[in-house]
C-alpha cells in the first residue's frame, strides 16, 4: 500500500473486517435501530497514518514551536519530546526561565567552573580526544556543552547506546554531562553506516511516537500503521490495514468498563498468579480445624491433617467419625467456618479464592466469545442457505447476523466487568456495580439462548432481547466508565 493512500478516519466503513475481533463495533452499528442509542461513543475519533505522514505531524509540531520561541529546529524536537509535544507548555516555561528550562531538557549544559590550562594543555585540548587518548585531530565533533571527542568514539558510543535500546537520549560522553545529542548530530556521525542508521531511525521513531500523547503504534503483528487520535481517552480504535482493535490510550485490548491502570494490574496478576492459583485450587484445601494448607496425594477422601491430626472428609470437610457410611461418595458441600482471627495463610487462601472467583468468570466469557465465533459462522451459512433457496433476501435475515454481533459486543463488555469488580472497594458503589453486572449477565445469557435457537425464536422476541441487553450494557458503561 502506498504511504499516501494509507490515511483513513474512524468514519470509514469497516464492515466485514471484524471476523477475528470479538468487539467490532461496526458489526453492530446497523443494529442501533433495535438497541439503545448510546449517549457516549466508545469509538475514538482517529485516523490511520503511515510513517511518512507521521513525520509530517512531527514537522508541523516543530514548525509550530519554532514560530513561538526562538530556537533551532534540531533542539525543538528534543523539547517537544521531553514535554509530550505540548507547545503551549514549552512556550510558557521558556518565558519563565529559558536557561534553566533548556538545561532541564538536556539541551544546554550546566555551568562548569572555569579551569586555567597551561600552554601545553591548551594546545592538546584543541585536537585531543579524552576517550581514546589520541591527539592531532583537526576537528572534533561536540554538542552544545563543548566537550569534544573524535568521530570514531562518537560512533562507538552511538552503537553502544543503540544496543541498549536508547536513541533519542544519547548523551554526551563526558562524565556527569547530561546534554543530549540531536538527531541531526547522530545521523552525521553514522552517515556511512547504513545498518546502524536504519536501526537508529527505527528506534528514534519509536521514541517520538511514544512521547506523543495522540499517537500510538498499531499493536497488530508487524503492522506499520500509526494511529492518531484527537483525544487521550481509553477508547477503541481499529486499524484499517490489519483490522486489529485496541485501546488507543494504553494499547491493550479494549477493556471498558475497566480503566487502563486497572487492566494493566489485572493482566500482570493473571500472568503471575494463574498457574499457581489453578494448581493450588485443584490440589490443596485447608484443614477445617487448624486451617493448614493440605495437598491431597492419593485418591482416598479420608484425610488426616499432619499438623493437628484431625480426620476429615476431603469432599465435605466433615469430621470423619460422624461422616456416615458413604465415605468415598460424599456429595455434601460445607463452607469453611469463619474464624475471628485468621492466620496469614488463611488470609492468603481467602485472597486466592477471591481472585479465582473473578478470574474463572473472566476466562469463561473469553471462551464463550470464541465459541460464539463459531455460532457467527453458522448463522452466516444459515443466511446464505436461505437466500440461495430463495427464502427471503440477505436484508430479510440480517437481523440474525445483527443478533450474534450484539451478543458478542455485550459479552465482551461483560468479560471486562470482572477485573473492574475485583479491584473495586467494598462500598455502596460496588453493590450498585455488581447489581448492574448481574443484570447484564442475565440479559446476555438470555440473548445467547435466543440466538442459538434463532429458528425457534420470532424476530420480534429476538430483537427485544437485543434491546434489553444493549440497554443494560449502555447503562453500566454510562454509570461506571464514561
Swiss-Prot record:
List the GO molecular function terms. ubiquitin conjugating enzyme binding; ubiquitin protein ligase activity; zinc ion binding
Q: What Pfam families does UniProt report for this protein, alphabetically?
A: Ariadne, IBR, IBR_1
| Residues annotated to bind Zn(2+) 3 | 218, 223, 239, 242
Known CDD domains for this protein? Answer: BRcat_RBR_TRIAD1, Rcat_RBR_TRIAD1, RING-HC_RBR_TRIAD1
Q: Which reaction does it catalyse?
A: [E2 ubiquitin-conjugating enzyme]-S-ubiquitinyl-L-cysteine + [acceptor protein]-L-lysine = [E2 ubiquitin-conjugating enzyme]-L-cysteine + [acceptor protein]-N(6)-ubiquitinyl-L-lysine
Q: Which ranges form a coiled coil?
A: 433-459
Span list, region TRIAD supradomain: 125-334
Q: Where exactly are the zinc fingers annotated as IBR-type?
A: 198-260
The transmembrane segments are none
Q: Where are the zinc fingers (RING-type)?
A: 129-177, 287-316
Q: Which residues bind Zn(2+) 4?
A: 247, 250, 255, 260
Give any Gene Ontology cellular component: cytoplasm
What the entry says about domains is: Members of the RBR family are atypical E3 ligases. They interact with the E2 conjugating enzyme UBE2L3 and function like HECT-type E3 enzymes: they bind E2s via the first RING-type zinc finger, but require an obligate trans-thiolation step during the ubiquitin transfer, requiring a conserved active site Cys residue in the second RING-type zinc finger. The active site probably forms a thioester intermediate with ubiquitin taken from the active-site cysteine of the E2 before ultimately transferring it to a Lys residue on the substrate.
- Give the protein family: Belongs to the RBR family. Ariadne subfamily.
Protein name stated in the entry? Potential E3 ubiquitin-protein ligase ariadne-2
Name the species this protein comes from: Caenorhabditis elegans
Q: Its encoding gene is what? A: ari-2
